[in-house]
From Swiss-Prot:
Name of protein: Acyl carrier protein
UniProt xrefs under Pfam families: PP-binding (PF00550)
Pathway given in the UniProt record: Lipid metabolism; fatty acid biosynthesis
Chief place where the protein resides: cytoplasm
Maturation and modification: 4'-phosphopantetheine is transferred from CoA to a specific serine of apo-ACP by AcpS. This modification is essential for activity because fatty acids are bound in thioester linkage to the sulfhydryl of the prosthetic group.
Gene: acpP
Protein family per UniProt: Belongs to the acyl carrier protein (ACP) family.
One of the record's GO cellular component terms: membrane
Residues that bear O-(pantetheine 4'-phosphoryl)serine: S39
Residue intervals of the Carrier domain: 4-79
SUPFAM superfamilies in the cross-refs: ACP-like
UniProt organism field: Synechococcus elongatus (strain ATCC 33912 / PCC 7942 / FACHB-805) (Anacystis nidulans R2)
GO BP annotations, alphabetical order: lipid A biosynthetic process
């Protein structure tokens, strides 16, 4: 799966989970600062990403995922 494919899927999931417009979801978007996620939203988002990509995101890794690109990079590293 290419970075573009991963980003597209992550973007859709983020938009749905955080109830934001897909156009607002950019690689550099911070889940909390730009997209208004609180800590519960972030946990739910991680769970949705785990399910969608059939991966496990450990708590330590989840804490380091602050932006959309962070999520894409982590997923790409697991898919490699």
């Amino acid at each position: 799966m290419s970075q573009e494919d991963i980003f597209s899927k992550v973007k859709d999931i983020v938009a749905e989970q955080l109830s934001v417009d897909v156009a607002e979801v950019k690689p550099e978007s911070s889940f909390q600062n730009d997209l208004g996620a609180d800590s519960l939203d972030t946990v739910e988002l991680v769970m949705a990403l785990e399910e969608a990509f059939d991966i496990e995101i450990p708590d330590e890794a989840a804490e380091g995922i602050a932006t959309v690109q962070d999520a894409v990079d982590f997923i790409a590293s697991k898919a490699a």
